[in-house]
Amino acid sequence: NELKPYKIAINQGIEMIMTAHILYPQLDNTTVVSEKTGNEEKKPATMSKAIITDLLKGEMGFNGVVTTDAMNMKAIADTFGQVQAVKLAIEAGADLICMPTVLYSLDDVKNLDAIIDGVEDAVKKGEISESRLDDGCRRILTVKENRGILDWKESDFSLNKALSTVGSANNRATEREISAAAVTVVKNENNTLPVVVKENQKILMLCPYDNERAQMIMGYNRAKEAGLIPESAEVKVVR
């Protein structure tokens, strides 16, 4: 049953699927020695050839692009070094590596260079086959061709166009439409949803981590700008 949504999406031609950094011992219980911890570590789905290559690309017939979730997440970063993590993900069948390192400054580029050098070295040593890289490139280029972005044209993707489009009122309206369409209400007792806010009513918004308050406030302000929240509404942050 867990695979059913993926089967439906694949049959309908979905082009990209993102892996999760979860352990799924029923599908893959293999381990690898971490260069960071020195211990035998179980492979998460992002590093599992059994899940990505054998199951997803093989048995389920997915011909699109497999991208990892952010590799700087603690589930990966606390257990594996950056170079080894990327190599294991590519070897497992990942075609795109999301955030293999964090680039805060020009000095951080050296970390990206080390990752690229590590992958190149792994190919030379036969740890990663050229056919694996060819497969990933083919999948990426196929999606770009299907989307009409195989050839970059400055006139179509200019900085001025980006500045006038990204974050515009129309752009954010489209974001809200996509977000609303992506939500499926499974249970709605007493017709709680949609929430109808009355005058002077208080609404509690929670976020799991302290560093997410800024995003919550940003979302609140954008909703207010769009007229989704009354101008007279106020927000108070409680820590």
Give residue ranges: language-model regions:
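Short, active-site-adjacent cap segments at secondary-structure transitions
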Residues: 23-27, 73-76, 211-213
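Histidine/acidic residue-rich metal-binding segments in metalloenzymes
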Residues: 2-8, 54
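Hydrophobic faces of well-ordered beta-strands that scaffold small-molecule active sites
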Residues: 17-19, 64-68, 97-99, 140
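Preference for extracellular/luminal or secreted protein segments
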Residues: 48-49, 58, 78-239
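Active-site mouth loops of central-metabolism enzymes
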Residues: 1, 72-81
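Short acidic, glycine-rich surface-loop motifs adjacent to enzyme active sites
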Residues: 9-43, 70
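Short, well-ordered coil/turn segments that N-cap beta-strands
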Residues: 8, 13-15, 60-65, 94-95, ...
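Alpha-helix-loop-beta-strand connector modules within alpha/beta enzyme cores
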Residues: 41-67
